[in-house]
Amino acid sequence: MRNGMRKIIAGVFIFVFLISNLYADLVAEVTTGVIQKPLVTVVSDNVVDQFPQQVNSVIVADLNHNAKLQANDTIKYEIKQKQNIPWKSLKSDYVVLTKYTNNSYNNYTVEVQILKRNDTSYLQAITYKNINVSLMRTLAHKISNYVYQKLTGNQGFFLTKLAYVKVSNPYARYGRLYELIISDYDGYNKHVVLRQTDNPIATPSWSNDGRYIVYSSYSGGSMGVYTLEIATGKVTRITNYKGINSSPSFSPDGKEIALALSKGYSDQTNIYIMNLSTKALKRITINGINTAPKFSPNGQSIVFTSDREGRPNIYVASVNSKYPQSSILSTKIHQAYEPNYTPDGKNIVFMNQSSRTSGTQIADFNLANGSVTNITNGKADSSPTVSPYGDMVAYISTNTRGYSSLDMVSLDGDNHFNIETADNGNILIQSPSWSPKNF
């Protein structure tokens, strides 16, 4: 029995990267759709200094990494005043005019003006003072958030973070290196916050205040769930049950986690809610293999994967039920894994294995009308995580050679961007988790 259980526990961890190679003989492709979005041109009063050019380049990249705007910096000469903007030759709907004042060595004041075609007044303006050049990318993301919010009415996500796992030598018997990495949303400013050899790190998930990451790991001869305090690097083990302890995620208020436990050497796992103060458990499911739980934004429901009817699918359970009970999300879905609510609670994004297509894609389920829409068209797409304001989804894609990449797609499926690519098959990228807020 114990030998069988060890195989099950090992399988939980290797599934994360084996799913990437499950369809290794098939090509993963994502196409970018064509959609008419307002065009923003970013211009500057300084095209000589390196700092203004760098900031504006990041702003343009940010404003192209979303579903609502597109941007360019086609004007390569200085524009000092709004009267100098060549609107007739521009196809832009808006211009973002950036003005840079070099106060002292490596210190700038930056004024940002948003102008609209056929409008002689400033639409919006803001000034950032005493900016050190070391904060170049942070400043650019702040400006992008400002512009995005003013032009779309939605909060920008350009100061959010991504946590993900990088595995080196993943197929070696010994010497496998697992690193938990936090980066900017666009893959820059990477920091390794946890490093382990031969002890897997799996399914990291943020707390809503952005202070903690909860994850599962196999350490000291057994599987457990841990929290990492990001500011200090302090790691705390919070479960020590026999068998499987996996797939943890925080409740919206941060007082509980949902997780999957086998509670002994069983081939079944069930969903539980753990109170982090008392460590008391509430059981949510009663049969089958149940895993990957995520709370709804209001904390009243949990969505998860279960094979109770013969194949993996998505189920929903109320956290307030007196007895364990849950229902299948939709009979339209053939096989599904790794569900995530969007922040408004109106959609569920998941890994979809349709009966009509080969491989796995990232799909969106509309809770209002029950529609299911694939938003990627690769053959081995997995591990979706939704941006904190719901516009974008980050996920893992794997190509025919087994190379994994961290990619991003808009929720409507029209825009696709690469964040990071493993340059050889000896490195795997796994389990992305989008931070709950801007930093």
From Swiss-Prot:
SUPFAM superfamilies: TolB, N-terminal domain (SSF52964), Tricorn protease N-terminal domain (SSF69304). Residues 1-24 form the signal peptide. The gene is tolB. Its main location: periplasm. InterPro entries: 6-blade_b-propeller_TolB-like, PD40, Tol-Pal_TolB. Keywords: Cell cycle, Cell division, Periplasm, Signal. The Tol-Pal system is composed of five core proteins: the inner membrane proteins TolA, TolQ and TolR, the periplasmic protein TolB and the outer membrane protein Pal. They form a network linking the inner and outer membranes and the peptidoglycan layer. It comes from Francisella tularensis subsp. tularensis (strain SCHU S4 / Schu 4). It comes from the Bacteria. One of its GO terms (cellular component) is periplasmic space. This is Tol-Pal system protein TolB. GO terms for biological process: cell division; protein import. Transmembrane segments: none annotated. The lineage of its organism: Bacteria, Pseudomonadati, Pseudomonadota, Gammaproteobacteria, Thiotrichales. Belongs to the TolB family. It is found in: Periplasm. HAMAP family: TolB (MF_00671). Part of the Tol-Pal system, which plays a role in outer membrane invagination during cell division and is important for maintaining outer membrane integrity.
